[in-house]
Amino acid sequence: ESWNGNSLNHLYVLDKDLKIIGKVEDLAKGETIYSARFMGDRAYIVTFKKIDPLFVIDVSNPREPAVLGYLKISGYSDYLQLYDENHVIGIGKETRGGDENFAWYQGVKIALFDVSDVENPVEVRKIEIGDRGTDSEALSDHKAVLFDKARNLLVIPISLAEKNNQTQSWNNDPDSAYGTLVWQGAYVLNINLDEISLKGKITHNEKYTGPVYIAAKDEPIGATRTDSSGNVWTKFNIMHYDYSSYGYGQWKTSASGYENTIFDDYNIDNFPGGINYVRNQVSNYQTQIKRSLYMDNVLYTISNTKIKANSLSDLSELNKVELPAEQQRYYGGVFAE
């Protein structure tokens, strides 16, 4: 709960009738809970404002939960993944700078905590990916995380931002400066009690080398464009708004399955070579990896546009499947009756 910016954090234990039977109140006053995880007789809670306290809480007696210990470090964890009974993985952001009331978040941080001494948990390993502006689906969707202890494997999506000499900062504070988005895909990490290291990277955002087109709205009637599945679309009409000379193009295809489908200029600009397609070569929601899994010795990564198979041994590409265009309609095509 929060009153006038002074937040209070509580843990409550409920019985089967949803009645409160135990509680720990007023944890980390002025901070906010970012993540929580339960394992056996312990609960782990991360709060954050300026630094990141990791609380270890004993819930073996549901009526008398108690804080066993806590660790204060820079950064925060949006997601906690249990490694084993004495170790926890935190996935979140590193932080630096700021003042006594806040810190600037930086790149994605992955840390391994040793909680075997519950009164004195320790951060034993960590890795920071990218600069301020780097992000990951794993911070808001736990299903985006692939972890396998036996294989020392951790895979998370990453949108990588990096700073350069032209990067602008706030009030000349370098910690406040955002990096430029330079890459998008999945980081494949080695993780064990001795290390967290990069094994390799996989992207679905392949570099485009085909033709580049003008804006679809500037194309004449009769112009054609080809979508990612090879279907040819033709501009057949320009619709004008009432009381305005501005109009938008209408495009159709003779491809099977699109008999009643009409796309406008914006849809066409997202086809290969279109102005939005080229502009979004680095940052593209459609090609952003959202899930990963493995079978035998093959790692599969999944985005809206494709499924890619890579060897778990050396991450070499084995195969890929392009998803049909009808699976990619996120741009509001107009459907006629």
Regions found by a protein language model. Give the residues of each.
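Feature marking well-ordered beta-strand scaffolds used for ligand recognition
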Residues: E1-E337
